[in-house]
Amino acid sequence: PTLILKSNETLKIFLKINLKETLLKSEDFLGLKINWDNYGHFGKINKQDFFLLNKHTKYRKQKDIKSNIVNQKLEVFPIKTSLLGAFDEPVETVINYCRDIVKEDDILVIGESPLAIMQGRYENYLNIEYDIFSKFLCYFFHPTSSLATASGMQILINKLGFTRIIISLIFGFIFKFIGIKGIFYRLTNPESSLIDDISGTIMPYDKTIVLGPYNPKLFCKKLSKALKIDVAVADVNDLGGVKILASSNKSIIKLLKIALKKNPAGNADEKTPIVIVRRKA
């Protein structure tokens, strides 16, 4: 069908898909790829989206979980899941995976990118319409930065506006000249530091740009209430960097920075987006 949408208007599409029973039995998840055309004053642009339909037939049990010793007082349990997608309600999904595993006084941590993916906060790089400004501004960043590509920079411009980006860059240059680094990211946080460019995420999301999660504080509050334990959302890398985006209890942040320093969830294709931190008796 062809539809006319006004600026900033939302279109909801309901699909009914008939699948063979043999296919459902043999696969743990299915991919739904949608191709569509965007037509307007700019001409025609071919776009595509990808969604994961997950069956979640293999929830983990306590006996399946392997412990990693952090020190004499802490151990961590990476929780392996199926591939997560935008059709997985975040709180309900994590509860299903962890309710038979967590114990009293445990702390549950989920990565910021898996949470953002379940919230549908990712975009195919082919759908991003970048302009001359984003192509120019991305050259001011380190080649490995997610803002060092026109698409990554355009995402940030779309979120914060061109004016704020320019002002932040100017102040960043001024302060860097006198020996103070990181001002740009301070002025554009949290959006700028949470963008993961393509190849920064597990397949099939390695061709998408993942934004930071929406309202992680509320997610922590809901999940903490349901499981009766503390919950946190973290951004962790293999270099020992640990950033706690949100938590149900601020007093656990110092402990989490110790427990997560070696990145027990991993940054490759481990499929362990959830980590249980447990205090040893």
What is the role of each PLM region?
Residues 1-281:
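N-terminal and secondary-structure boundary signal
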